[in-house]
């Protein structure tokens, strides 16, 4: 399977951790966005939305990290522990995945990306949205070791990729006790966290 990615990208790193958890070897293809490689005709033919991560499994192409994670588990998982078949458990996992995409990671992108890529000043109102997102996550984790149930799922891997990116950006989430406790545990139990952290440090260069 070909996997088009950037190591600094949190969505890409969440897929890499999922593949590691499943014991899948991906043929990693580095895509240089700054050089416009994602806009070349050969890549647009694979993914007309020209985004990363993008997975190519035979004649099937898929993008959007959370969709890729679920696809890999459903097709290649030896069991359903990362994405249980129980409708209620699966619904909670999906909610957490959508929360990551639409609230938590979005708050990161909205606050930090203009500063990184457009040299814009920090917006205190957008900072408050990041704090609100962490408040929600902290509430979700009340009384729970994992973000969606009693064991590690794709929701943990997606949120771990995001939260570790907040860490290298310098966002202090220590005051969110449940998040801090979950993060400390998730780092030790998530397969492939070392590679995830290497990608985080790559991304951190944007802040130097």
Curated annotation (Swiss-Prot):
Gene name in the database record: GST1
Recorded catalytic activity of this chain's protein: RX + glutathione = an S-substituted glutathione + a halide anion + H(+)
Protein name per its UniProtKB record: Glutathione S-transferase 1-1
Domain GST C-terminal per the UniProt entry, residue ranges: 86-207
Family indicated by similarity: Belongs to the GST superfamily. Theta family.
PANTHER family with a match to the protein in the record: GLUTATHIONE S TRANSFERASE D10, ISOFORM A-RELATED (PTHR43969:SF9)
PROSITE patterns assigned to the protein according to its UniProt record, in alphabetical order: GST_CTER, GST_NTER
Assembly with partners or alone: Homodimer.
Biological process, per Gene Ontology: glutathione metabolic process
Record-listed glutathione binding positions: 9, 50-52, 64-66
